[in-house]
UniProtKB/Swiss-Prot annotation:
Belongs to the Ycf4 family. One of its GO terms (biological process) is photosynthesis. One of its GO terms (cellular component) is photosystem I. NCBIfam families: PRK02542.1 (NF002712). The gene is ycf4. The keyword Transmembrane applies. It is found in: Cellular thylakoid membrane. It comes from Prochlorococcus marinus (strain NATL2A). It is a multi-pass membrane protein. The chain crosses the membrane at residues 34-54, 68-88. Its main location: membrane. Keywords: Membrane, Photosynthesis, Thylakoid, Transmembrane, Transmembrane helix. Seems to be required for the assembly of the photosystem I complex. It holds the Pfam family Ycf4. This is Photosystem I assembly protein Ycf4.
Length: 191
């Protein structure tokens, strides 16, 4: 029992000196749906093209064997190949969980470590915590809305650290920014 209490106490001390945030990547329901629809649609177009070329129905619906191959069957085959290539790309992004990673603020080492999963390699960035001037909230509404948390860094451009994708609710964005600003003991800008 005493070892458990010591462990929890050391975890609390560690959590007071280290703030770690997990960032979600491309493993979202919407990406699974898009990849599935592209796969099914691509196979459907390819089967329609093959039906047109061979004169046999490979699809249970419709009668694609009656299509003339040169204009329609060929174009349907090209659509099928394009959809299939896009589906492969989406499945690859989902497989590697593109964009996922960790924001780790470590007061012991005095370093902010950002890591993200890239398409071909992982991206690692380390910045000294004392170079962070402020935490900035960016909110832009309209056709292409933007809601993100960025860090104002001395001598550099702002560094976005929030997840990419659908805009976060404003309350969640404010809470995330306030938590980081409180931990780093810097100002929160953009409210």
């Amino acid at each position: 029992m005493s070892s458990e209490s010591k462990l929890s106490q050391s975890e609390k001390e560690l959590s007071g000196l280290v703030l770690e945030q997990k960032i979600k990547g491309s493993r979202k329901v919407s990406n699974y749906l898009v990849a599935s629809m592209l796969s099914i649609g691509g196979v459907g177009f390819l089967l329609a093209s093959f039906s047109s070329y061979f004169g046999r129905d490979f699809l249970p619906l419709g009668n694609p064997s009656t299509l003339i191959f040169v204009p329609q069957g060929l174009v349907m085959g090209l659509y099928g190949v394009a959809a299939f290539l896009l589906a492969i790309y989406f499945w690859r992004l989902i497989n590697i969980d593109y964009g996922s990673g960790v924001n780790r603020f470590d007061k012991n080492k005095g370093v902010l470590s950002l890591s993200r999963r890239g398409l071909f390699k992982n991206i690692e960035i380390e910045i000294p915590i004392d170079e962070i001037k402020a935490v900035k909230l960016e909110v832009r509404e309209g056709f292409n809305p933007l809601r993100r948390v960025s860090l104002r860094i001395k001598g550099r451009k702002d560094l976005p650290i929030s997840r990419v994708g659908s805009p976060q609710p404003l309350l969640d964005l404010e809470n995330e920014g306030a938590e980081i600003a409180r931990f780093l003991e810097v100002n929160l800008e953009g409210i």
